[in-house]
UniProtKB/Swiss-Prot annotation:
The lineage of its organism: Viruses, Duplodnaviria, Heunggongvirae, Uroviricota, Caudoviricetes. This is Uncharacterized 36.3 kDa protein in nrdC-mobD intergenic region.
Length: 308
């Protein structure tokens, strides 16, 4: 059996092959390797499934970094740890004391956890607002950096400072109201009297981008029945208010999530499926080349027959 150090060296060799990656990305992965070094467990015995799962995960991770240009270092570190750490560890009590891992990829989850209960609509909406504010950065995924380098709109944004859910309890004049407000943080508003038009325009583009992302997010959330948004373009800094209607908590049943708790080969299948697509594309390309070469060969044969 291979020792833990073998796998760490193996991961490190994978990273070495990707020298063209941004320095920050390599540092993030190296931090994970250091975390793995500190793992406390049966360190001399790691099963073959663990080797496969971690090597495939890291390969996917490197490809993910290659595609992603909107990652801040903080978001990257948090998501990478979620991607790489096992959800739980089972220790098989045997002569070999083998440690097995069940790795679940949490990076792509963009939904809130279930808040379904038998509570009233008002309490349900209040809980939605609370959970939304707690998870707003996770919900917007990699949106802390909204725009790429080199763009005149480049700005680093902490979404939690710009997007806030507010729950207004029932009053004598009407029912409760649940809304999400997209606007510039207080620190930016303080500088409004001294702000140049180009700077205000940059912030307004940020608000428009966040509003678009919020609409997309709400349209995919199965707990949301409908929503209506209104943007005040008359202000120096725009402000968007989104009024939300949630489904009845006594009738709403969240879409059941598939239980992959014991699916230890999920990562393996995903990796092999990706490789299969790549190989099929290569076959298609080589088939075209083969057809062209066959046509050329037939042409040469015909020419030879004519010249006989």
């Amino acid at each position: 059996m291979k020792t833990r150090k073998h796998y760490i060296d193996y991961f490190d060799s994978l990273i070495t092959k990707h020298r063209d990656y941004q320095k920050g990305h390599r540092e993030v992965i190296n931090n994970i390797l250091r975390d793995f070094l500190d793992y406390i467990g049966w360190e001399n015995h790691i099963c073959k499934d663990t080797q496969n799962a971690y090597s495939h995960s890291l390969g996917s991770l490197l490809e993910w970094f290659k595609r992603s240009r909107l990652l801040s270092s903080v978001i990257a570190v948090n998501n990478v740890k979620k991607f790489m750490y096992p959800s739980y560890i089972e220790t098989n009590v045997s002569n070999d004391n083998v440690v097995t891992f069940n790795i679940i990829n949490d990076v792509k989850r963009t939904y809130l956890e279930e808040w379904f209960s038998k509570d009233s609509k008002e309490k349900f909406a209040s809980e939605f607002s609370h959970e939304f504010n707690n998870n707003v950065n996770m919900l917007f995924k990699h949106s802390r950096r909204l725009f790429c380098h080199g763009d005149d709109r480049t700005i680093n944004v902490n979404v939690k400072d710009w997007v806030t859910a507010k729950f207004i309890p029932s009053s004598q004049n009407g029912p409760f109201e649940l809304l999400i407000i997209v606007c510039a943080p207080h620190e930016i508003y303080k500088n409004l009297p001294y702000m140049k038009p180009c700077e205000a325009n940059k912030h307004n583009k940020t608000i428009r981008s966040l509003t678009y992302k919020l609409r997309t997010l709400l349209s995919k959330m199965d707990v949301v029945e409908s929503f209506d948004d209104n943007t005040n373009y008359g202000l120096s800094l725009f402000e968007t208010k989104v009024v939300i209607k949630l489904k009845d908590p006594n009738k709403f049943k969240p879409t059941p999530k598939p239980n992959h708790g014991n699916d230890t080969m999920k990562e393996e299948r995903e990796y092999l499926s990706t490789r299969l697509i790549e190989v099929e594309k290569q076959i298609e390309e080589h088939t075209k080349v083969l057809k062209d070469l066959t046509a050329k060969a037939n042409g040469l044969r015909n020419a030879i027959e004519v010249l006989k």
